[in-house]
Amino acid sequence: MLSLDQIPHHIRHGIVGSRLIQIRGRVTQVTGTLLKAVVPGVRIGELCYLRNPDNSLSLQAEVIGFAQHQALLIPLGEMYGISSNTEVSPTGTMHQVGVGEHLLGQVLDGLGQPFDGGHLPEPAAWYPVYQDAPAPMSRKLITTPLSLGIRVIDGLLTCGEGQRMGIFAAAGGGKSTLLASLIRSAEVDVTVLALIGERGREVREFIESDLGEEGLRKAVLVVATSDRPSMERAKAGFVATSIAEYFRDQGKRVLLLMDSVTRFARAQREIGLAAGEPPTRRGYPPSVFAALPRLMERAGQSSKGSITALYTVLVEGDDMTEPVADETRSILDGHIILSRKLAAANHYPAIDVLRSASRVMNQIVSKEHKTWAGDLRRLLAKYEEVELLLQIGEYQKGQDKEADQAIERMGAIRGWLCQGTHELSHFNETLNLLETLTQ
């Protein structure tokens, strides 16, 4: 009989790392979306198979915690068919997603599988869904502006390659239209878009009407609609980030868009409350505020490529102190505020420039660009200051030289701030127009 030392290394490694006895448990309790099962040896984050003895069920679930020697699991699909006879079989692995160039042009579900139920080619690699962010000292500094093709952003809220920004908007603020424009016009190699908690009707409409064949060609979509289980909606954000990380590791410039962080947080809230966590700020358990930086810090520069990320945040009643909005703004490198008032006036993109900011803009733009942007901001602020007086007929020309200048140029400024959804503006063209407006 061979000793372990006489077995070839690759076989020995497999034997040492494997479970020689198949472990099975059984469901002991089902409460809402949470399962409890006695399954020895499982780890948090590990996937398990749920099967009925008559093979009427085949479903995966993820271990999210433990309580009194029982594992707490959340299924990755619908719970119909689970019974007291359902067996729980650990897989010994965490959730991974298949990645590769074949994903370009594909629409995936929240778990990284084809949305239409089809089959994908053999992946180039498998990436874990949960990964650590790049070490702080290994990140390259953000030094290069990234042209997003939107004049108001490139000119006044310049985004750097590897920056993370939030797009804050109430319902109907025009964020979906802005995202579609960004996908078509951003000067990047690959775009990864996560649609989390969207209405099912809007998905195909967005792909065919807003995105179009041109936008889809260099994009990967990860979609988890509002009717999907909470675990799938929560995982969609991590799956999209893992796919973006693969393309970053190939040396590409990646644009990661997520719509929306609020619905991601709500899915995490459902999971946390089901696991028995105490509700804190407006009903959100502590795990939500731990998940947000764990997700967002994975974007950014690495030694190989970059992920520039824009996350949309639904703001309830324009309340920027709402917990998810407040926490997200503190994590990210800038914020773009969309105004319902501007959207109602058919001013698109409906960006409120004076309430928006890019935290890295001053580090990456030229001195002239910084001056022109500052001058235009001053004109916008001055016009806002005297707008009410203009509306009631109380402003007299000549009272304030800077106000006169702002009023005189406001038509041209608004024309520059507005941009059609299919209109592309190159970075240098944007700067030339910005210079003209402020001279």
From Swiss-Prot:
This is Type 3 secretion system ATPase. Belongs to the ATPase alpha/beta chains family. T3SS ATPase subfamily. The core secretion machinery of the T3SS is composed of approximately 20 different proteins, including cytoplasmic components, a base, an export apparatus and a needle. This subunit is part of the cytosolic complex. Forms homohexamers. Disruption phenotype: Deletion of the gene does not affect the growth rate but causes total attenuation of the pathogen in a mouse model of bubonic plague. Deletion mutant is not able to secrete the virulence-associated V antigen (LcrV) and is attenuated in a subcutaneous model of plague. PANTHER family: ATP SYNTHASE, SPI-1 TYPE 3 SECRETION SYSTEM ATPASE. It holds the Pfam family T3SS_ATPase_C. It comes from Yersinia pestis. Deletion mutant may function as an attenuated, genetically engineered, live vaccine effective against bubonic plague. Mice vaccinated twice with this mutant at varying doses are protected against bubonic plague in a dose-dependent manner. One of its GO terms (molecular function) is protein-exporting ATPase activity. Disulfide bonds: none annotated. ATPase activity and YopE secretion are inhibited by selected small-molecule ATPase inhibitors. The keyword Cytoplasm applies.
